[in-house]
Amino acid sequence: MHDRNIIDIHNVEFKPFDRYGSPVPNMSWHIISYDQISGQGSYVLKMDPGAQTVPHTHMGFEEFFIVEGELIDSDGMVFKKGEFVSFEPGSQHSSFSEIGALIIVFQRGLNHPLEEH
C-alpha cells in the first residue's frame, strides 16, 4: 500500500493565506503536508500581483521553488521562475511580487512575524 498525496499545482483549490492568524491580502495557499503547529511540511503559495509577505524570522529552514512569476526580497534580490531559494534558520526577510508568483514552499520550523521579537 502506498501512502502518498499527488496534486496538480495548476488545478487545486486555494484558500486565503492565514498562516499568521488573519488573511494576508493578495495571497492564498493550498496545504500539501504543512502542519501549522510544528511549522513542518509543504504548501503551494499563490501571490497575486502586488502581494507582500509579512516580515518574518525563520526558526528552521524555509525553502521554495518558483514555478511562475518572481519575487523581490526585502534586500532587493530578485528570485525568478525556475529558481530554488533556501533561507537558513534565524534569517529575517519579507518578499514582494509585482507580477505575481506561484511557489512551492518547504518549511522545517515555524516562521514568526518580526513584531513578535
Cite the ranges covered by each PLM segment.
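Short acidic-glycine-tyrosine-enriched beta hairpin
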Residues: 73-93
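Long, charge-rich low-complexity segments
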Residues: 4-7, 108-117
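Conserved short histidine dyad/triad with adjacent acidic residue
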Residues: 28-58, 88-92
